[in-house]
Amino acid sequence: MAKMQAKVQADERDDGLREKMISVNRVTKVVKGGRILGFAALTVVGDGDGRVGMGKGKAKEVPVAVQKAMEQARRNMFKVPLKNGTLQHEVHGKHGASMVLLAPAKDGTGVIAGGPMRAVFDVMGVQNVVAKSHGSTNPYNLVRATLDGLRKQSTPGDIAAKRGKSVEDILG
């Protein structure tokens, strides 16, 4: 079975959302009469201000699969608390055999991340971050692991509320 990896394509919609297609794979279903060919697309969507979502779509034609994936990504968006264009703190994410380490970076560092992780940070609007992946490099698992890590982000206000202290006490 042939596998097609598409280049990451970016799009800006009229609703202000940034869209990136991460991969398109040709998939087959073997039935009694032969093989049924189809396509699976993986996409991420973000608003450039901390909101991000991922979607996966399957169809007989590539454009239909990509459209389904984009719609699913829009439905699955969530907000990530950012601090000056980077992350709040270092965090680990995991999905399946993929593990990622996401760390904030100083201004001017840029996005140091591989393939699918870079697409997630681009649509989110993160300008400075260091990310390292371990284990499986499957694009779907890497995106899910990255989103898992981003969901674990917490603001100083969240931590202060959990501990019953003020934000000033937490920040020192």
From Swiss-Prot:
<dbReference type="Pfam" id="PF03719">
    <property type="entry name" value="Ribosomal_S5_C"/>
</dbReference>
<dbReference type="InterPro" id="IPR013810">
    <property type="entry name" value="Ribosomal_uS5_N"/>
</dbReference>
<comment type="subunit">
    <text>Part of the 30S ribosomal subunit. Contacts proteins S4 and S8.</text>
</comment>
<dbReference type="InterPro" id="IPR005324">
    <property type="entry name" value="Ribosomal_uS5_C"/>
</dbReference>
<dbReference type="GO" id="GO:0019843">
    <property type="term" value="F:rRNA binding"/>
</dbReference>
<comment type="function">
    <text>Located at the back of the 30S subunit body where it stabilizes the conformation of the head with respect to the body.</text>
</comment>
<dbReference type="GO" id="GO:0015935">
    <property type="term" value="C:small ribosomal subunit"/>
</dbReference>
<dbReference type="GO" id="GO:0006412">
    <property type="term" value="P:translation"/>
</dbReference>
<keyword id="KW-0687">Ribonucleoprotein</keyword>
<comment type="similarity">
    <text>Belongs to the universal ribosomal protein uS5 family.</text>
</comment>
<dbReference type="Pfam" id="PF00333">
    <property type="entry name" value="Ribosomal_S5"/>
</dbReference>
<dbReference type="InterPro" id="IPR000851">
    <property type="entry name" value="Ribosomal_uS5"/>
</dbReference>
<dbReference type="InterPro" id="IPR018192">
    <property type="entry name" value="Ribosomal_uS5_N_CS"/>
</dbReference>
<protein>
    <recommendedName>
        <fullName>Small ribosomal subunit protein uS5</fullName>
    </recommendedName>
</protein>
<keyword id="KW-0689">Ribosomal protein</keyword>
<comment type="function">
    <text>With S4 and S12 plays an important role in translational accuracy.</text>
</comment>
<feature type="domain" description="S5 DRBM">
    <location>
        <begin position="17"/>
        <end position="80"/>
    </location>
</feature>
<dbReference type="InterPro" id="IPR020568">
    <property type="entry name" value="Ribosomal_Su5_D2-typ_SF"/>
</dbReference>
<keyword id="KW-0694">RNA-binding</keyword>
<dbReference type="GO" id="GO:0003735">
    <property type="term" value="F:structural constituent of ribosome"/>
</dbReference>
<keyword id="KW-0699">rRNA-binding</keyword>
<dbReference type="InterPro" id="IPR014721">
    <property type="entry name" value="Ribsml_uS5_D2-typ_fold_subgr"/>
</dbReference>
<dbReference type="InterPro" id="IPR005712">
    <property type="entry name" value="Ribosomal_uS5_bac-type"/>
</dbReference>
